[in-house]
Amino acid sequence: MGCDRNCGLIAGAVIGAVLAVFGGILMPVGDMLVEKTIKKEVVLEEGTIAFKNWVKTGTTVYRQFWIFDVQNPDEVAVNSSKIKVKQRGPYTYRVRYLAKENITQDPVDSTVSFVQPNGAIFEPSLSVGTENDTFTILNLAVAAAPHIYTNSFVQVVLNSLIKKSKSSMFQTRTLRELLWGYKDPFLSLVPYPIPTTVGVFYPYNDTADGVYKVFNGKDDINKVAIIDSYKGKRNLSYWESYCDMINGTDAASFPPFVEKSRVLRFFSSDICRSIYAVFGSDIELKGIPVYRFILPAKAFASPVQNPDNHCFCTEKVISNNCTSYGVLDISKCKQGRPVYISLPHFLHASPDISEPIEGLNPNEEEHRTYLDVEPITGFTLQFAKRLQVNILVKPARKIEALKNLKRNYIVPILWLNETGTIGDEKAEMFRNQVTGKVKLLGLVEMVLLGLGVVMFVAFMISYCACRSKNRK
């Protein structure tokens, strides 16, 4: 009987040891299986989970606009006073609802090329007003004229056309006109062929962004979704040195197995440059653990604060010899028009930029850009892209509408918040197919290992105790 009991205890200990060993073996083997599955499913080719969602996003994307309505246009034009603005919005559009087009796989270099059609549908229920709401804003054509045409004689001619068209420094426009374009009366009088339609995002509807050429990940999963070229080029021709490079992905996804220490690099055609995000915090999104990556303040810092930004400083006067920060001059990619990009309300901008403007209230929580990335797959499941469009206007002695100005203004026109969050149905599918299976595998591994160790220790203690008792 003693032998039977001892044998039973030994058998229990052996079973425990086997379970513990199996649990231990399952950890690396399970991780290998997960890694193999993920690598297969994030490749951008027909039949994978990634490809289906890549061709047409399953996430509803909204772009909200807040317009800066100028309250004292005459004071500014006559006395060069501070510009008083009042933010009005949001006015919401649904965007990025069209599938990618002209998708072409290249098996030779493991890339896939495409264009992204543009479209915007107004959402009245998510807006404070209609597309016919009017705003007092900077006259985009008048403000740009002295930047594009620097010759004094040409400016004299332009001044006569500005006066003839009854244009001034400021104008009243509807939301639809401001965003998507209007026939400008001044430009319509110019006696030689130039574009006469003006709008912050003109042209947009029925256009396409690209051609993009990205790596599909078949030969190297660490390159999946990374942009190989944009419009047939690997550089932008806007900036000097490495600032001109097209880096990273389009931010919709990143190579899998994202670590917190990784810097996520991505290219945005909206701001005509590549930029990056760094880890901010762990959060849970609809039951899915994600890493929140944020755009750091140093991305728009001056070269004095961040020497890596020296090649983004393209002129010395407006930037106070490259000491101002928080704005980016993108005029080179806007046909010479004096467009400056910043974070909303000049968040993280130097005081000299915001000093001539009253009515701004920068807020880190409301105005920062972030990406919520699921670390196993590298998919961006939620994002908020926030940026502000500004126009530089400066004194011009030959143009009466601008001759009374005594300072340069970087005038905020509007700011936008483009957001997307994985839907409930997609989130459930993601939990079931990805994170749920990984969690279950991890739980099984820990249960087997823990149960095996406990059984082994318990049965061995009992066996030793039993033998000790029998000897006595």
Swiss-Prot record:
Pfam family membership, one: CD36
UniProt PTM comment: Palmitoylated by ZDHHC5. Palmitoylation is required for proper localization at the plasma membrane. Ubiquitinated at Lys-469 and Lys-472. Ubiquitination is induced by fatty acids such as oleic acid and leads to degradation by the proteasome. Ubiquitination and degradation are inhibited by insulin which blocks the effect of fatty acids.
Annotated spans, Required for interaction with thrombospondins, THBS1 and THBS2: 93-120
Key words, A-Z: Cell adhesion, Cell membrane, Disulfide bond, Glycoprotein, Golgi apparatus, Isopeptide bond, Lipid transport, Lipoprotein, Membrane, Palmitate, Receptor, Transmembrane, Transmembrane helix, Transport, Ubl conjugation
Lipidation (S-palmitoyl cysteine): C3, C7, C464, C466
Cytoplasmic side: 1-7, 462-472
Spans annotated as Interaction with PTK2, PXN and LYN: 460-472
GO annotation terms (biological process): amyloid fibril formation; amyloid-beta clearance by cellular catabolic process; cell adhesion; cellular response to diacyl bacterial lipopeptide; cellular response to low-density lipoprotein particle stimulus; cholesterol import; energy homeostasis; intestinal absorption
UniProt topology in membrane: Multi-pass membrane protein
Annotated site residue numbers, Critical for TLR4-TLR6 dimerization and signaling: Y463
Recorded family membership: Belongs to the CD36 family.
Protein name per its UniProtKB record: Platelet glycoprotein 4
Gene designation per UniProt: CD36
